[in-house]
Amino acid sequence: HQLSGGMRKRVALAQNLIVNSELLLMDEPFSALDVQTRQIMENDLLRLWSEFRKTVLFVTHDLEEAIALADRVVVLSSGPAARVIGDYPIELPRPRDVAEVRLDSGFMNIYRTIWQHLHGEVKKAYERTRAR
């Protein structure tokens, strides 16, 4: 039998929790999933986080995902010599549902604030790839 992409992600998340380290590093863990499975996995992560209370370092290129999941979003500059260009507290109520929180006016305000600073970096990265 083969596991679906979503089930493989669940197994990987369970393996990370079993190791029982204080820090859980997740580098774009849901990027290959369809939207519906992705939202289920994001809600699973939030539920498990609230239960186990580990520190999670979650790397993503998806600003909405970052805001929906995080208590803090750190934005890096584009390019190989990336540096921190922004650090934003996410003060949205918990527990959260990742689909519902996106409809919150506070979510949209946070998104606009971060996007104002991030947009220039996105354009720089895009221009670099076009120049190749």
Positions of predicted regions on the chain:
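Conserved signature/switch motifs of ABC ATPase nucleotide-binding domains
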Residues: H1, V19
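Conserved H-loop
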Residues: R53-V59
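Conserved catalytic segment of ABC-fold P-loop ATPases
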Residues: A68-V75
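Conserved beta-strand-loop-alpha-helix hinge in the C-terminal portion
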Residues: S78-Y111
